[in-house]
A protein has these predicted regions:
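Active-site phosphate/pyrophosphate-binding segments
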Residues: 1-132, 140, 152, 181-183, ...
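Short secondary-structure boundary micro-motifs
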Residues: 27, 36-37, 172-175, 199
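Intrinsically disordered, low-complexity segments enriched in polar/charged residues with Gly/Pro
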Residues: 29, 176-177, 212-213
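Short, flexible segments with low predicted structural confidence
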Residues: 42-43, 171, 202-203
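Acidic, Ser/Thr-rich peripheral helices and adjacent loops at domain boundaries
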Residues: 130-170, 176
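Short, intrinsically disordered low-complexity segments
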Residues: 158, 166, 173, 184, ...
Length: 270
């Protein structure tokens, strides 16, 4: 909206394009369906406990937070729409960061942790930054990371590389195990022509339809948030007690102690 209402219309038009694709495309070519199937496979069948959203464009720096809210609030359930308790994983923890920031923060974990984290890499062909050569450097890292996560590097290759660099056998024996990357880490690559209101609208709709399909496959209702509602109801009662001075609290012992401590410190600093 800050860019003008016409840009907001473009965002809606981009979303509508994915709406039509979702309705019309056959299942084997339906992008939201394919993404949903991959997510269910990785989480429910292979046991992946989290998924990373990694956009390589600063204008998408809030995308991972939005996807976290959209997917975890929609599908973070443990009961089917028939009221039966679910005995299988439903949704992973969604998290992420702009690509280059993430490379210097948690990519080590993605590459060599014993927890496999599926990741969505999101980039564009055209740059929106007028800095000469910047986008090619950025996208070189983009493609390199997905390649490294897919292929990895085994100990034989590590030893050969170190030997070619003139390292001693003693050094190679010590370092080689630490440089092994097992690879076979699942990633999706979403490559847009250019980051724009239209493509952002399409991207958001793509993920929202994917979340809906996941809910259908998992047999859960994606459109309620009773877990959130429980906390809101409790907060209303606790807020009254925080504002009162009565020592009698209608709370469990743990919460009562925390409330009493809060009120005590508040009186001291008043």
């Amino acid at each position: 909206l800050d860019l003008g209402f016409e840009k907001f219309i473009e965002l809606l038009e981009g979303a509508h394009e994915i709406d039509e694709h979702f309705c019309d495309a056959p299942l084997e070519k339906n992008a939201p369906v394919i993404l949903a199937l991959l997510s269910v496979w990785n989480c429910t069948f292979l046991g992946a406990q989290s998924q990373a959203i990694l956009p390589y464009d600063q204008s998408l720096h809030m995308l991972s937070a939005y996807m976290q809210q959209a997917e975890m609030e929609s599908n973070g359930k443990s009961v089917t729409w028939h009221g039966k308790e679910i005995d299988y994983p439903t949704v992973p923890t969604i998290w992420g960061e702009v690509g280059i920031n993430g490379q210097h923060a948690f990519y080590q974990y993605l590459h060599q942790s014993n927890n496999v984290v599926p990741a969505d890499f999101i980039g564009s062909v055209e740059s929106v930054t007028p800095v000469q050569g910047h986008h090619e450097t950025l996208m070189a890292n983009f493609f390199a990371q997905t390649q490294a996560l897919m292929q990895g590097v085994d100990e034989t290759q590590v030893r050969a590389d170190l030997k070619a660099k003139g390292r001693t056998d003693d050094y190679i024996n010590k370092v080689a195990p630490h440089k092994v990357h097992k690879g076979n880490r699942p990633t999706n690559t979403l490559l847009m022509k250019r980051i724009s209101p239209r493509t952002i609208g399409s991207l958001i709709a793509l993920y929202e339809h994917k979340i809906f399909v996941q809910g259908i496959i998992l047999q859960i209702c994606s459109f309620d948030q009773w877990g959130v509602e429980l906390g809101k109801g409790l907060a209303n009662e606790i807020e009254k007690e925080l504002r009162e001075s009565s020592n009698k609290l209608n709370q469990d012992s743990s919460t009562a102690e925390l409330i009493n401590y809060f009120r005590k410190v508040k009186r001291e600093v008043a």
